[in-house]
């Protein structure tokens, strides 16, 4: 490379080098600014997190752990990882944290690698009751490599059937019991799960990927000291970059998890992401994060109450956390049709199966809604009640139209109201 081309490589902007990608990013920024984000697993990160994630830390390979790397030149990325570890430990009140998992699936796989052998039995919440793919779905590695015993919710009230958990644990003697899910809107009884795990000699693993921000903010009971290990993603209610964390109080387990992450599952960690995790943990340690977590729950409850008043069923009758499942059958709608219609009205959500759902997984009878992203924008109860009424308006219009194409007039009217709302709560002004 000539001096001129080298200078160009280091200094040309994305807009100059790749206008197609630059354009796609610009359009996505517009979508995020003007639409209401209700996907429960999504959030909006701070400028500080974005800057760390987009930093030159991405250039550095750092196989191993701080102070024990297989590459030279790691003295500064060590600072970032050590900060991430210490802040995660402080945030959740634990003795050990591994901040290297690249995703939620990989953090859970690392725990399996550390605690299970192929063919061993573990228990997890059934996907149809609000569990996760990695909790034993037959299409996932967890369901292919291990003997999975699933538990679920009761058909009457859609609450966890703890008697079923105890009965199946006694019958199948699992090595691991997973508590936690992706679409359960009530408080988890960690103490009862630990009692059941102890009764059969199982490890209790808590996947708190969805509720970790609420745990950190004091709005949901901590799984510690009840669990042996907890895993969480960092990009949902924690409001950080995409990635995972493994937490424990037990040194012998911490060593197993470290070995499982590296070299068991991953090679070089993503140091720019770890730096961004450290920033997000630092933000979550501030007093205002507790206010944020409390507002999430208030907003979710306001939304659920509004939807119920509008003639919709909310699974289990409401929510204690950041999310809810909405049963659409009273509106003669499916999750697939509702997701599309709401999307056309600039309200983003995801179709989701409800417990004992008669519809196919790609159709579903429900949608899942969450409050974290809207709360980050500054929405409070009044805005979420307005959003709830807009959702009812779209679904009522869909019912009248009785067409997959929706009700264009209603959706256009709601779309205008959504833009008026989001314009009052701007984001990333510095991006122009």
Curated annotation (Swiss-Prot):
GO cellular component, one term: cytosol
Positions marked as site (Plays an important role in substrate specificity): 235
Primary location: cytoplasm
GO BP term, example: glycine biosynthetic process from serine
PROSITE patterns the record matches: SHMT
Entry EC no(s): 2.1.2.1
N6-(pyridoxal phosphate)lysine found at: 236
Family according to the record: Belongs to the SHMT family.
Subunit structure: Homodimer.
Protein name: Serine hydroxymethyltransferase
Organism encoding this protein: Rhizobium etli (strain ATCC 51251 / DSM 11541 / JCM 21823 / NBRC 15573 / CFN 42)
Gene from which the chain derives: glyA
């Amino acid at each position: 490379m000539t001096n001129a081309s080298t200078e160009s490589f280091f200094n040309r902007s994305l807009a100059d080098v790749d206008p197609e990608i630059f354009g796609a990013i610009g359009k996505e920024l517009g979508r995020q600014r003007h639409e209401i984000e209700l996907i429960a697993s999504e959030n909006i990160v701070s400028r500080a997190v974005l800057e760390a994630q987009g930093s030159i830390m991405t250039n550095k390979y750092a196989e191993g752990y701080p102070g024990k790397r297989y590459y030279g030149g790691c003295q500064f990325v060590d600072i970032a990882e050590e900060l991430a570890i210490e802040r995660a430990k402080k945030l959740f009140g634990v003795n050990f944290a591994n901040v290297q998992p690249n995703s939620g699936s990989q953090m859970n796989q690392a725990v399996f690698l550390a605690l299970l052998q192929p063919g061993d039995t573990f228990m997890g919440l059934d996907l149809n009751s609000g569990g996760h793919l990695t909790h034993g779905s037959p299409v996932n590695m967890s369901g292919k490599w291990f003997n999975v015993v699933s538990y679920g919710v009761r058909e009457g009230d859609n609450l966890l059937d703890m008697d079923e958990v105890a009965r199946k644990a006694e019958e199948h003697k699992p090595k691991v019991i997973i508590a936690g899910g992706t679409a359960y809107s009530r408080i988890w009884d960690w103490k009862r799960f630990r009692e059941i795990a102890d009764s059969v000699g199982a490890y209790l693993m808590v996947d708190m990927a969805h509720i970790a921000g609420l745990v950190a903010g004091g709005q949901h009971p901590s799984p510690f000291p009840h669990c042996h290990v907890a895993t969480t993603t960092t990009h949902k209610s924690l409001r950080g970059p995409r990635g995972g964390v493994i937490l424990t109080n037990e040194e012998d387990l911490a060593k197993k998890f470290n070995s499982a992450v590296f070299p068991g599952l991953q090679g070089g960690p993503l140091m720019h992401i770890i730096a961004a995790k450290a920033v997000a943990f630092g933000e979550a340690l501030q007093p205002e994060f507790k206010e944020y977590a409390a507002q999430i729950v208030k907003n979710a409850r306001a939304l659920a109450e509004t939807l119920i008043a509008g003639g919709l069923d909310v699974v289990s009758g409401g929510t204690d956390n950041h999310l809810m499942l909405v049963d659409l059958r009273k509106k003669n709608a499916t999750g697939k049709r509702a997701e599309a219609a709401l999307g056309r009205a600039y309200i983003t959500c995801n179709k989701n199966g409800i417990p004992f759902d008669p519809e196919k997984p790609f159709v579903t009878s429900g949608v899942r809604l969450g409050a974290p992203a809207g709360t980050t924008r500054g929405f409070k109860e009044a805005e979420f009640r307005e959003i709830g009424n807009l959702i009812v308006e779209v679904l009522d219009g869909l019912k009248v139209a009785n067409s997959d194409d929706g009700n264009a007039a209603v959706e256009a009217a709601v779309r205008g109201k959504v833009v008026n709302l989001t314009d009052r709560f701007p984001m990333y002004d510095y991006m122009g």
